Design a protein with these regions (language model features):
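Conserved SAM/AdoMet-binding glycine-rich loop
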Residues: 41, 45, 296-404, 408-448, ...
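A short beta-strand-loop structural module common to alpha/beta enzyme folds
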Residues: 67-79
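Radical SAM enzyme core and accessory elements
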Residues: 2-28, 32, 38-40, 485-618
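Canonical Radical SAM [4Fe-4S] cluster-binding loop centered on the CxxxCxxC motif
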Residues: 52, 253-289, 596-617
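Glycine-rich beta-alpha loop elements in corrinoid/cobalamin-binding modules
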Residues: 76-222, 461-509, 517-531
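N-terminal [4Fe-4S]-dependent radical SAM core
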Residues: 9-39, 46-47, 204, 210, ...
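A glycine-rich phosphate-binding loop feature that marks nucleotide/adenosyl-phosphate handling sites
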Residues: 195-205, 312-317, 341-347, 410, ...
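N-terminal pre-triad scaffold of radical SAM enzymes
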Residues: 38-44, 62, 249-275, 299, ...
Length: 618
């Protein structure tokens, strides 16, 4: 539902369907009959936000509670934003059309550090003060979660509370407490102090941060009864976890326009650069029976003809073949294709391939991450060259002719020879295609090589490592391009400038807040979009604020330095991460969790693969 003022703008903007709501399966409630109104804000465009599984789950979860009405808010694209500012139209929610400032909670899911300026811009467009200290009443409570909550410090001055870990349970606990506090006439501070006692809730205003003369952190000091360490929340029984039986079906084409079914959380592998592989430990699976039934309901209620099996590594699902047997038993008849978007090189077997082929072939994507075997050992990828070639040969024999390969440059200990091996590996895949006798005849192979830049992230063994400087990253990108000698390989790479700013925010502290506030004042937004990003403008702001961004991005930390996220516990011990970092420099790999428990600390949750492994050893 949109106002007449908004309607007048729709013919003047790209994709007006982004801004009107009214989609199939949206939830409409009588706002006079609910106690809590939650504006679920995704700090990017409609197409990106509507593709996000976490938003789909929490939107349905909140709205399954009678007294909560959760509505969606997305960042308007530049053309719409300009018109809204000109006509002084505040940011609004799609379902009711009401201004965001009318809501009790303004919640953000933070998937990417470069969305921080969008978060602040959305508050600004809502006429809501960006600083937490300036929002004094028990309304417009700004909350945030998602992987960027691993290090909440750069935006700690703006957010009232962060949800640490998985949100299905803690979110509702906070909503219920809010309802109670408002009925009792409590103030905002009293509400926040009580929220801080809930496991998985971090209230930044209840902590003092002091610094050493060299700019590093001296101490985090909790105020009052705030806990010294905030422990993450997680769902232990995935079969019992909430999952929607329908999704809001978008009016415009979105990035991932299909049904998405989560099959497990966590990852058994432990790639040393991968934040998700550590913060979502331990691995917890859904049963094939539950997954199959949920897929049926989703496809029936949304009309989608593709279902994507979502996880960090779908082929590591322990019952992948029985699951595919169940799915293909009805997907073929219903003309529903099955997508496995996160396949490991060593997980694409003949059996899996044949199951997928019976429905409809979708694209294949693999992530070797490094071109040389030495570098794959450094990052603990545990994938051999011959395995990759055999996997590609299997795919080519099965009728596939396009393969996407994801790599990362700038990793610790990397040399130019390692970088050139990325191009060489792509060439080996091309050669394998023409060496496969039973490939599709009369077709050419297309290999896409994509190289992102290493960004050191919290709660990984590489969290202490420096990022390569921008000139070095550009040199490595050019070296790959020069090393590719065939037009059958397409080379894509991430902009080094944006990766640099991502690294600044990923390992930043509260001193960055003044730079972000100044960026908001100057209308920065969509930093993750290359046509909107201007590094020089950021460097100017950092200089004005007396901040050296290289201090955060390009500096190696010592193991005994207090890190901005050290007061948060994601279940993996710092001692384990240090041990893994040292093993990387010795080119030593660590077995995955099903082969051996490496003692990361996640077994303490009493659930998941690592706990099962330890139980079997007793």
């Amino acid at each position: 539902m949109v106002s007449k003022e908004v309607e007048k703008l729709l013919l003047k903007v790209q994709k007006p369907g982004r801004y009107v709501g009214g989609e199939l399966n949206e939830v409409i409630k009588d706002k006079r009959k609910v106690d809590v109104r939650f504006a679920f804000c995704f700090p990017d465009t409609y197409e990106v936000g509507m593709s996000h599984l976490g938003m789909k789950i929490l939107y349905s979860l909140f709205n399954s509670v009678d007294y909560i009405w959760c509505e969606r808010v997305f960042a308007p694209w530049i053309d719409m934003e300009e018109l809204m500012r000109e006509r002084q139209i505040p940011l609004y929610a799609l379902e009711s059309g009401d201004p965001v400032s009318d809501f009790d909670f303004i919640g953000f899911t933070l998937q990417y550090e470069l969305s921080y300026t969008n978060m602040l811009n959305m508050l600004k467009m809502s006429n809501v003060p960006i600083y937490s200290r300036d929002r004094t009443e028990l309304k417009n409570i700004v909350v945030a979660g998602g992987p960027c909550a691993c290090n909440p410090e750069p935006i700690a001055d703006f957010v009232d509370m962060f949800f640490i870990g998985e949100g299905e349970e803690v979110d509702l606990e906070v909503m219920e407490l809010f309802r109670e506090c408002r009925a009792e006439g409590r103030c905002k501070l009293e509400f926040l102090e009580r929220c801080a006692q809930i496991e998985g809730v971090y209230v930044p205003s209840l902590y003092e941060v002091s610094y050493n003369d060299d700019g590093t952190i001296a101490a985090f000091t909790p105020k009052g009864n705030a806990p010294a360490v905030i422990h993450k929340r997680l769902m232990k029984k995935m079969d019992e976890s909430f999952y929607p039986d329908n999704f809001v079906v978008p009016l415009v084409e979105i990035v991932h326009d299909r049904a998405v079914q989560e099959i497990f959380r966590g990852c058994i592998r432990g790639c040393r650069f991968c934040q998700a592989g550590f913060i979502y430990r331990p691995v917890r699976e859904k049963s094939p029976e539950v997954i199959n039934e949920q897929c049926k309901k989703l496809c029936m209620n949304t009309g989608y003809d593709e279902v994507s099996l979502s996880s960090l590594s779908s082929s590591d699902y322990s019952q992948i073949v029985p699951l595919l047997e169940k799915l293909t038993s009805w997907c073929g008849e219903e003309k529903v294709s099955i997508s496995l978007p996160s396949l490991r090189v060593d997980g694409f077997t003949d059996e899996i391939m044949n199951k997928i082929k019976t429905v409809r072939k979708s694209g294949l994507t693999f992530a070797p991450e490094a071109g040389s075997q030495r570098m794959r050992d450094v990052i603990n990828k545990n994938v051999q060259h011959d395995e990759l070639m055999q996997t590609c040969a299997t795919a080519f024999a099965g009728g596939w002719t396009t393969v996407k390969l994801y790599f990362m440059i700038g990793l610790p200990t990397e040399t130019m020879d390692d970088v050139a091996d990325i191009a060489h590996l792509g060439q080996s895949v091309v050669d394998t295609y023409y060496q496969t006798p039973n490939r599709s005849k009369g077709k050419s192979v297309r290999v896409t090589v994509s190289a992102s830049s290493f960004v050191p992230k919290p709660f990984t063994p590489f969290q202490w490592e420096p990022q390569d400087t921008i000139p070095v990253l550009r040199e490595k990108q050019a070296h790959i391009k020069e090393s590719i000698t065939t037009k059958k390989i397409t080379f894509n790479y991430h902009d080094a400038d944006t990766s640099f700013l991502e690294a600044v925010f990923a390992r930043g502290d509260r001193k960055l807040a003044k730079a972000m506030a100044l960026a908001c004042e100057r209308d920065f937004h969509f930093d993750g979009w290359s046509d909107c990003f201007d590094l020089q403008k950021w460097l100017d702001i950092f200089e004005e604020c007396g901040i050296d961004p290289a201090f955060y991005a390009n500096r190696r930390r010592s193991f005994d330095e207090i890190l901005p996220w050290d007061h948060i516990d994601y279940g993996v011990s710092k001692q384990f991460l240090i041990k893994e970092c040292r093993k990387a420099y010795n080119n030593t790999t660590t077995p995955h969790c099903r082969l051996q428990c490496s003692g990361c600390g996640a077994a303490k949750y009493g659930e998941g693969v690592c706990f099962e492994k330890r139980q079997n050893l007793v």
